[in-house]
Swiss-Prot record:
Function: Substrate-recognition component of a Cul2-RING (CRL2) E3 ubiquitin-protein ligase complex of the DesCEND (destruction via C-end degrons) pathway, which recognizes a C-degron located at the extreme C terminus of target proteins, leading to their ubiquitination and degradation. The C-degron recognized by the DesCEND pathway is usually a motif of less than ten residues and can be present in full-length proteins, truncated proteins or proteolytically cleaved forms.
Record protein name field: Kelch domain-containing protein 10
Pfam families registered for this protein in UniProt: Kelch_4, Kelch_KLHDC2_KLHL20_DRC7
Alphabetized UniProt keyword annotations: Kelch repeat, Repeat, Ubl conjugation pathway
Tagged with keyword Repeat: yes
Length: 411
């Protein structure tokens, strides 16, 4: 059997603590994102499968991916076997979603983006990264899982709303899904994944300047390689790639010891991590989310083979110390997606929230992982009390004293 592939509150601010002991931790709070929606733009001439009228927010889904910049959250692909939730007869790609959505932070509105070009058809458990104004998509699977996998790189320029397939040479990875991917020093690294039947521990690298793939051959003996896996996540510090969790259809891997690929020595290393007091280590998991801010990595949710997890943990890549943050997902989920803005605000969307009922969600949540800067605090309050700013012309915004950078966030 093939492996599964799809699986207006105030900002945090200083408050008077009621008799809390010194050293106690302020509770981290989740905020449901404002649900204000717009209809998709009718003037774009694109195939109906790319843009379904009447959809004001992304339907519930799993196995999708998302990325974020200062202005938008981009959500691509996904899977939902529920015929009605997936759009019924309007969705030509049922049970998949061949669509790209963006959530505009300044207005709190969802837009289904009309795009030209060749959008990928492998829409579950693909990899997605943001590189400048470009979305890079690799791998993924169609339906049935494992029967129509991909190993091409697709690029969507979000400024011009156009898809293209990257012509690459060299030894491409196998047709896989559930792999992890990151851009480091101008190279696109891909690790692990599954064909649906066989799990991988391969590490590939694409030179984005020459567009040549190579398979890296670490110096370790075969017994010292990481276990084969899918639906793991990776982080990096410029010197090593760190593999976080993942597993197979029947197991989930521990986070007590982390596999790390050393660029300089071309070897895999095992790095023990430090427990968080009496709480110890995060539970083993797969199908979780992971975001990174400098040398801090945050993992959230996932599935350990028994229950859906809703916890939030931080790993310091300098000390390898785990810290459990005092926040729980309002809807514990796996096969969800998460992304963090440059300012340090994490957004989480979708996922499987009930195993017995095979239920998915379309909810969107945000949480600040760092103390927001004064600029960000002022900006959010400005948008809260003057929501009409997005409707003003640029020259008027400049007259009001807004910087060009902030004006760009309104568009």
């Amino acid at each position: 059997m093939a492996a599964e592939a799809g699986g207006g509150e105030p900002l945090v601010k200083f408050v008077k603590l009621s008799g809390r002991a010194a050293g106690s931790k302020k509770k981290v709070r989740w905020f449901p994102v404002r649900r204000l929606f717009t209809h998709s733009c009718p003037s774009l001439r694109i195939p109906s499968r790319f843009l379904r009228e009447g959809r004001r927010s992304p339907p519930a889904r799993s196995g999708h991916r998302c990325v974020a910049d200062n202005t938008n959250l981009y959500v691509f692909g996904g899977y939902n076997p529920d015929y009605d939730e997936s759009g019924g007869p309007e969705n030509e790609d049922y049970p998949l979603f061949r669509e790209l959505w963006r959530y505009h932070f300044a207005t709190g509105m969802w837009h289904q983006m009309g795009t030209d070009g060749h959008m990928p058809r492998e829409l579950a458990s693909m990899s997605l990264v943001l590189h400048g104004h470009n979305l890079l998509v690799f791998g993924g699977t169609g339906i049935p899982f494992g029967e129509s996998n991909g190993n091409d790189v697709y690029v969507c320029n979000v400024k011009y709303k156009r898809w293209s397939k990257l012509n690459c040479r060299g030894k491409k990875p196998n047709r896989i899904y559930g792999q992890a991917m990151a851009i480091i020093h101008g190279f696109l690294y891909v690790f692990g994944g599954t064909t649906g039947y066989i799990y991988s521990t391969d590490l590939h690298r694409l030179d984005l300047s020459t567009r040549e793939w190579i398979q890296l051959k670490p110096n370790n003996p075969p017994c010292d390689l990481p276990e084969e896996r899918y639906r793991h996540e990776i982080a990096h510090d410029g010197q090593r790639i760190y593999v976080l969790g993942g597993g197979t259809s029947w197991t989930a891997y521990s986070l007590e010891k982390i596999h790390a690929y050393n660029f300089e020595t071309n070897t895999w290393e095992d790095i023990p991590t430090k427990p968080y007091g009496n709480l110890g280590f995060p539970a083993a998991r797969r199908c979780h989310s992971c975001v990174q801010i400098k040398n801090e990595v945050f993992i959230c949710g996932g599935y350990n083979g028994l229950v859906i997890l809703g916890d939030l943990w931080k790993l310091d890549l300098q000390t390898f110390q785990w810290t459990k943050l005092p926040a729980l997902m309002p809807e514990p989920a796996y096969f969800h997606c998460a992304a963090v803005t440059p300012a340090g605000c994490m957004y989480i969307h979708g996922g499987v929230v009930n195993i017995q009922q095979n239920k998915r969600t379309g909810s969107l949540f945000k949480i600040w992982l760092v103390v927001p800067s004064l600029l960000e605090l002022c900006w959010e309050n400005l948008l809260k009390y003057f929501p009409h700013l997005c409707q003003l012309p640029t020259h008027q915004l400049l007259q009001l004293g807004l910087s060009q950078e902030l004006i760009e966030r309104l568009k």
